C-alpha cells in the first residue's frame, strides 16, 4: 500500500490523508446531531478491535522529542489496551524518521507485559528487509509472545529518505520496481515462516543431520496464518489474496471512482476474498481496516477532536494518481457507533484498527481506549 495503513498524524488532530493535495468530496458525512442510541443491538458477530500506534516522538505537547519515552509509552499503552478489553496493539514502522523503526524488540517488550492481546505491525516496509532474517526475528518474537503476532508487511509508504534502501544495501536491478521486489521478498518470507526448506545442508559439517533442505529456525507453528499484506488498491488486494496473505487496508485508497470511500473499500475486501478462495487457500482469509474515531466525553476531547464531527471523505491526487481517504468519526459513543454501523467496509472487516495519538501520553490514550470499548459494547461486537 502507499502505505495504506501508514499516514502520519499530529497529536491533536485526527488522521487526514495528505491534506495539501486532498479536497473535500462527497461521501459519508457527520453532522454530530444523531440521536443518542445504540446503532446496533448487542448480539452481533465479534469484530476485533485494536489500536495502530504511529510512534511519533515529535510534536509532543509540553515535552522535547524523546525516543525512549515513546517506546516506554507504547508498551504501557499495550497494557492499558488489554485492560480496556481491546484485542490488538499494532505498530507503524518508519525509517530515517522520529518514529518506530525496529518493531520486533518493541513487540517482544509488549509481549512481556501482556497476556492476551494480539501484537501487530501495520506495516513493515519490505524495501528495507532481508526476508530470511526477518523470518528468524518474527518467529522468535512470536514464540516469546505465545503466538500472538499479527504481522503486516508491504511495499511501504512515501518517506523522508531519498536513498534509504540503498543505504541499507538494497538497490534495484535494471527493469525492477520496488513493487516487484517487495512481492518476491514477501513470498520468500512466507515460505520461511511456513517452515519450508530454504538452505542446502552441508553433510560434511557435522551439524546437518538430514539431506533435506534446512528450514529457518526457530519455527513458530501458525505464524504463517497471521501474516498480512498492506493493500492500498484493489489490484494489490487481489494479489494478496492469490498469495495467501490476510489483507490490511486503511484510511486511504490509491484509487477513486467517485463512490464513498467505505463503499469502494468494501468492494476491495470482497475482491480480495474472491481471489483468496479462487487460489484454494484454506480458511476465508482475514481482513482489517484502519479508521480514525474519537469518543468525545469532556471539554479536553472537544478541544482536540470536536471539529472532526463534520469530517467527511477527501479526494485528490497522490503519487501521480487518484486517491480517496475516509472521514474521522467523532462524537458521543452512540454517535460514533452509529457512524461505524453505516460503514460498509467496517461491516465487512474482521479487524478494525483505530489510529491513536500516542504523543498525548498513556493516561489520555487509556481514556480513548475505554471510549472505543464502549462503542464496541453498543454495537455488540465484543460478544
Spans of features found by a protein language model:
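Flexible, glycine-rich active-site loops centered on histidine and acidic residues
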Residues: 45-67, 128-198, 255
Amino acid at each position: 500500500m502507499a502505505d495504506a495503513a501508514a499516514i502520519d498524524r499530529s497529536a491533536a488532530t485526527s488522521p487526514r490523508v495528505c491534506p495539501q493535495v486532498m479536497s473535500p468530496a462527497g461521501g459519508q458525512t457527520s453532522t454530530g446531531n444523531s440521536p443518542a442510541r445504540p446503532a446496533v443491538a448487542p448480539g452481533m458477530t465479534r469484530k476485533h478491535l485494536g489500536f495502530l500506534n504511529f510512534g511519533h516522538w515529535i510534536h509532543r505537547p509540553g515535552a522535547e522529542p524523546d525516543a525512549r519515552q515513546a517506546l516506554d509509552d507504547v508498551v504501557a499503552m499495550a497494557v492499558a489496551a488489554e485492560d480496556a478489553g481491546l484485542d490488538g496493539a499494532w505498530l507503524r514502522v518508519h525509517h530515517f524518521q522520529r518514529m518506530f523503526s525496529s518493531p520486533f524488540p518493541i513487540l517482544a517488550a509488549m509481549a512481556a507485559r501482556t497476556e492476551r492481546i494480539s501484537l501487530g505491525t501495520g506495516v513493515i516496509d519490505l524495501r528495507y528487509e532481508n526476508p530470511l532474517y526477518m523470518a528468524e526475528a518474527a518467529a522468535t518474537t512470536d514464540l516469546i509472545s505465545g503466538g500472538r503476532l499479527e504481522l503486516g508487511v508491504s511495499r511501504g509508504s512515501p518517506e523522508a529518505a531519498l536513498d534509504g534502501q540503498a543505504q541499507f544495501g538494497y538497490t534495484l536491478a535494471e527493469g525492477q520496481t520496488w513493487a516487484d521486489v517487495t512481492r518476491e521478498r514477501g513470498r520468500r518470507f512466507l515460505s520461511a515462516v511456513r517452515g519450508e526448506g530454504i538452505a542446502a545442508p552441508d553433510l560434511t559439517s557435522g551439524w546437518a543431520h538430514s539431506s533435506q533442505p534446512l528450514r529457518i529456525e526457530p519455527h513458530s507453528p501458525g505464524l504463517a496464518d497471521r501474516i498480512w499484506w498492506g493493500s492500498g488498491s484493489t489490484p494489490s488486494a487481489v494479489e494478496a489474496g492469490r498469495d495467501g496473505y490476510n489483507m490490511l487496508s486503511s484510511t486511504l485508497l490509491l484509487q477513486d471512482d467517485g463512490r464513498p470511500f467505505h463503499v469502494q473499500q468494501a468492494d476491495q475486501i470482497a475482491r480480495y476474498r474472491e481471489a483468496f478462495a479462487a487460489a484454494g487457500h484454506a480458511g476465508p482469509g482475514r481482513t482489517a481496516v484502519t479508521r480514525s474515531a474519537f469518543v468525545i466525553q469532556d471539554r479536553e476531547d472537544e478541544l482536540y477532536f470536536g471539529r472532526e464531527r463534520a469530517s467527511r471523505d477527501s479526494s485528490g491526487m497522490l503519487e501521480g494518481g487518484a486517491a480517496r481517504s475516509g472521514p474521522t468519526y467523532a462524537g458521543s459513543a452512540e454517535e460514533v457507533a452509529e457512524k461505524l454501523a453505516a460503514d460498509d467496509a467496517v461491516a465487512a472487516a474482521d479487524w478494525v484498527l483505530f489510529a491513536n495519538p500516542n504523543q498525548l501520553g498513556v493516561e489520555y490514550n487509556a481514556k480513548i481506549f475505554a471510549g472505543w470499548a464502549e462503542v464496541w459494547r453498543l454495537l455488540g461486537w465484543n460478544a
